[in-house]
Amino acid sequence: MVDKNSLRKLMLLKRAELNDLEKSHLDQKINQKLMAFLITRPTIKNLALYIPIKNEVAFLDNFLDFLKLNKITSCFPSIVDQFNMKFIDQNNNEINPNDIDCFFIPLLAFNKANHRIGFGKGYYDRYLSLTSKKQLKIGIAYDFQYAEFTNDPWDYQLDLIICNG
């Protein structure tokens, strides 16, 4: 089994190898699945998204339009300091962790138990520890980001991973 740091490097490389057309096609498939997921859960009104970096799955315009049409409010992470983050709305107001119905969470790798590997700073693991089990935590990834690894006790287990496949 590969160690987490090697796995991070490998997945960053794999994402970087996607050409624009491949990435656009995969992102479109995933965005369609995200919309289908949200349609089945009409109680989700406050959704935590992320601003994609380093070739993470992007939220496309049709997805963002879907959120507006369905009156789903989106919020985004904002780094507070080297250990903590918060989520803010479009007016830069901090959102209480318990007011978020569902989190769409980026990742570098995931395993069969829905544990994720991120960039290794622990921002999401610490933030999600403030939330309740009722709030959905959904990992967003490409299929090729699946890997077998041993999770650490502090690694947060997600409810579901949504991929292109």
UniProtKB/Swiss-Prot annotation:
SUPFAM superfamilies: NagB/RpiA/CoA transferase-like. Its cofactor is Mg(2+). Involved in folate metabolism. Catalyzes the irreversible conversion of 5-formyltetrahydrofolate (5-FTHF) to yield 5,10-methenyltetrahydrofolate. It comes from Mycoplasma genitalium (strain ATCC 33530 / DSM 19775 / NCTC 10195 / G37). The keyword Ribonucleoprotein does not apply. Keywords: ATP-binding, Cytoplasm, Ligase, Magnesium, Metal-binding, Nucleotide-binding. It catalyses: (6S)-5-formyl-5,6,7,8-tetrahydrofolate + ATP = (6R)-5,10-methenyltetrahydrofolate + ADP + phosphate. Disulfide bonds: none annotated. GO terms for cellular component: cytoplasm. Signal peptide: none annotated. Mg(2+) binds at D125, D155. This is 5-formyltetrahydrofolate cyclo-ligase.
